[in-house]
Amino acid sequence: MEVTLLSLLESDLPFLIEVRNDESTRSQLGNDSLFTLEDSTQWFKKEQPEWLLIINHNLTRIGYMRIDGDTIGIDIHPNFRRKGYARLAYQKYLEDTDYADLWVFEDNHAKKLYEELGFVETGEYETLRDRKYLKMIYEKWK
């Protein structure tokens, strides 16, 4: 099993919205708002994000990687969760990265994955929707 990371294109936005607006995705994000395709298209054209599409060996869209400077995160389509795709995508991305950070709710199952990948808690957190939202960092040289 392998994944490929490709630049997210405007034509991928309907897929992004399908994943992003799923309740199981939104519940784990700092911003749990619903977005329309129109909202996303305007955002995409204005921000020109360096986000990545995650595809599998069959060229099926699996999810996407959010990148904002050093801050990263992955959202996987519900049909492909718990199959190792997020781990593979993070590993591929981190191969060429010395530092990255992310935010995760303390009760998110993915926190264990982040720890296994080498992310550590910084002690910094926010309280969102009555839950702790923790900052974790990855430093290759440690």
Q: Which positions does each model-derived feature cover?
A:
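Conserved beta-strand-loop-alpha-helix junction that forms the acyl-donor binding cleft
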Residues: 102-115, 119-120, 126-132
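A short, internal acetyl-CoA/4′-phosphopantetheine-binding micro-motif in the GNAT/acyltransferase core
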Residues: 71-85, 104-105
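Hydrophobic pocket/interface hotspot
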Residues: 16-17
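Conserved N-terminal entry element of GNAT/NAT acetyltransferase domains
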Residues: 1-11, 139-142
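Conserved GNAT-fold acetyl-CoA-binding loop/helix
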Residues: 24-43
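Conserved beta-strand in the GNAT
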Residues: 59-75
